Structures are given as C-alpha cells and as structure tokens.
Amino acid sequence: MIFAFGGCALFASSFYSVQRTCQTRLFAPKIAAFCFWGWQLVILLAAISLPLGYTSSKEYAELEWPIDILITIVWVAYAVVFFGTIMQRKTKHIYVGNWFFGGFIITVAILHIVNNLELPVSFTKSYSLYAGATDAMVQWWYGHNAVGFFLTAGFLGMMYYFVPKQAERPVYSYRLSIVHFWALITLYIWAGPHHLHYTALPDWAQSLGMVMSLILLAPSWGGMINGMMTLSGAWHKLRTDPILRFLVLSLAFYGMSTFEGPMMAIKTVNALSHYTDWTIGHVHAGALGWVCLLYTSDAADE
C-alpha cells in the first residue's frame, strides 16, 4: 500500500505537476524511465523476498540490504530528475506544491539511509548497527516520518496542485501554504517518540514526542482548512463534479487523522489506545481515506 501504490502515485504526480508548474519538460527523461523500472523492480523483489522470510524485521523498513541499496539508487535518480526539472524551469517562482514534493524527497532519503545502516552477514541477512532503545528510537524516527513525509508531505504536494486545478480556483491563502510547509517540515521530524510511550525510551524523549505532536495539530489543520477553503466560490461544483467530492472527502480524512494523531500522542490517552484497533483505524483513515481518495481523484482528473 505505502511503497507500491503510494510510491508509484508520488512518482507519477510529482513528475506530472512539476512540468506544468515549471513550464518545462522533465529533466533527463531516460533517468525518469529508470526511476519507473527501478521502482517496479523494488516492488517485485519485495513481493518475492518478504513471503520467503527474508526481512530485517523493521516496520516499514523490512527489506534486506541489497534491496535497500536499489531503493537508494532509484531515489537519487528521482531527486536528479525532479530537482533538475526545477533548475531548468521557465518560471521565476517555485510553486508551493513543488516545495512539498522536494521536502518529501530529501527527508525520505535521509530517513532511509540512517535507519537502514546495517552489517550484512550474507546476501539475504543483515543486522542493524543500532541496538536496544537506540534501535527503537531510530526505527520510529523513521517509521513516523515515513508516514509523515511519504504519505503526508508528498501527498500535500499533490493536493496543492490538483485541488486548485479541479476547483478552477487559486489556493485560498498562498501565505498559509508556505507557513504550512515550513511548520510541517520543522515539527514533524520530532514527533516519532510518541510511538514508544511507556517503553525503555527515556521519559524526556517520550514527552518531547508528545509535545511536538500536539503542536503539529496547528499546521496540519492549517493545510486542511487551506485545501477546503480553496473551494470558496466553487462549492456549487460539488453537486455535479464527483472528482471534487472525492478531493474534499480526502481532505476531511486528512483533518480527522491529523486530529487523532496528536490526541493519541497524549500519554494518558495512549495508555488506553495503544495496542487497540483504534491505532489501526487511525492509520487506515490516513492511508485509505486521505491517500487513496486523493490519488484516485487525481488519476480520474487526468
């Protein structure tokens, strides 16, 4: 769901929108083609290796070291194409959607490399360089931000292109979208410890994760409101435009998920919610409600 569906959606939508917002063709089309085939190979190898039991056992980072290296190569190629296209743009301004795509590309690269530092013992087995509470902290720094940047920042870049396009209205507040970007980039990276409440992780780190999660509610809802209010003067289109309905519904799920996340990060709430189906429902609201509804709407748009 995350890397096959979500990954392909992000490659496609970022390559599509960056050309139109920069008024230029893709930089290095052959490298872009390599990104496509390389990512399909990653998905194929994952589909083969995981059922056979070849796994690092890390959530969201289960793939073994040879596939990790392939992901790194493909991701560097992705960055070259995307940022190369921005460098050759015909417009002076870099559209806010491209800021979100760019932030997602850079941050996911850092997360992937740091969390997957491993000592290979064979072609199909490796051991993490981290251990104990440190390993848990690095893993959930990665795990939380894989969701935060892969499924949030990247798809917000998608939202900031397709919602105004489908509504035929400018972004409600461009200034708010810039504040949204920098606040999200600054705060999201610190919230990972809320996955490790009541564990061996130092209490100060757990509390820091909780506080950052609560602060994160403001930029998250700022972005959701900005997307919704972009329909100002175009609400009547919801009667006849099914694509716009799905886009609005995806924003509603984004708002709901980003309210649940900070609430569940509160230690007293987490004591009740952890290890329950509420956590699973929270993740599914984001992945199936926000991500799937947004991208299927975008695909239908084109």
Feature locations, PLM:
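Short aromatic-rich membrane-water interface segments that cap or initiate transmembrane helices
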Residues: 1, 61-69, 133-148, 207-213, ...
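Hydrophobic cores of alpha-helical transmembrane segments in multi-pass inner/ER membrane proteins
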Residues: 2-12, 70-83, 146-160, 214-226, ...
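Membrane-interface helix-loop-helix modules in multi-pass inner-membrane proteins
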Residues: 2-92, 120-126, 191-212
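Cytoplasmic membrane-interface regions of multi-pass membrane proteins
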Residues: 17-24, 83-92, 159-169, 226-236
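Membrane-interfacial loop-to-transmembrane alpha-helix junctions, especially the N-terminal start
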Residues: 24-39, 95-101, 170-183, 239-248
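C-terminal ends of transmembrane alpha-helices
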Residues: 43-58, 81, 106-135, 158-163, ...
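Short helix-boundary/re-entrant hairpin motifs in multi-pass inner-membrane proteins
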Residues: 139-192
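Conserved small/polar residues in nucleotide/adenosyl-binding loops
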Residues: 295-302
